[in-house]
């Protein structure tokens, strides 16, 4: 168990804002025992228990698509110094076998997800809030590339979800919290140097924040 409450960082951004690379870069600034990451994506309710829309495309971009209680419970457990276990979410990809994820407590806890600011009980736990943003067309092109390669979606499916699920959810559940965040990261380039520099700066600040005071 950790001796003291961890420093909790919330990271959120629109689809295609570069969260995955940002998170990898950020976490890599720390040793494994220094940081823990818990992601909202691993708390999706299985699609076969949701209500399909008329065109049979599921809407994953709603707060009700997440097992909110389990997400909050596991964050609390990590803050109390306990490990948590969760089956990986595979985005309904039948070619992927989900693995069991173990998250162990650490001095820095990163909470990531679209709704982490909207869920009041989770937002209250955060010591720092980081908002990632990319221009809409840039974000859409990134989403198209990812969903073709990783999830086997057609362009028609991706564009439908973008216009009817992704952007409405972003505008309603995330964008209103942008100005309340401690740091807004604009990520309109695919040059990794920008994100590497920003994550280096933030990690340095965090080390200072969690350093025991004499």
Predicted regions mapped to residue ranges:
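Post-Walker A helix-loop "phosphate-sensing" segment adjacent to the P-loop in P-loop NTPases
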Residues: 28-36
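The conserved Walker
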Residues: 15
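Hydrophobic positions on the alpha1 helix immediately C-terminal to the Walker A/P-loop
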Residues: 22
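Conserved lysine of the Walker
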Residues: 19
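Conserved nucleotide-sensing/catalytic segment adjacent to the nucleotide-binding pocket
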Residues: 36, 45, 49-93
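ATP-dependent NMP and nucleoside kinases share a basic, alpha-helical "lid"
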Residues: 97-149
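NTP-dependent small-molecule kinase module
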Residues: 2, 104-105, 145-148, 167-214
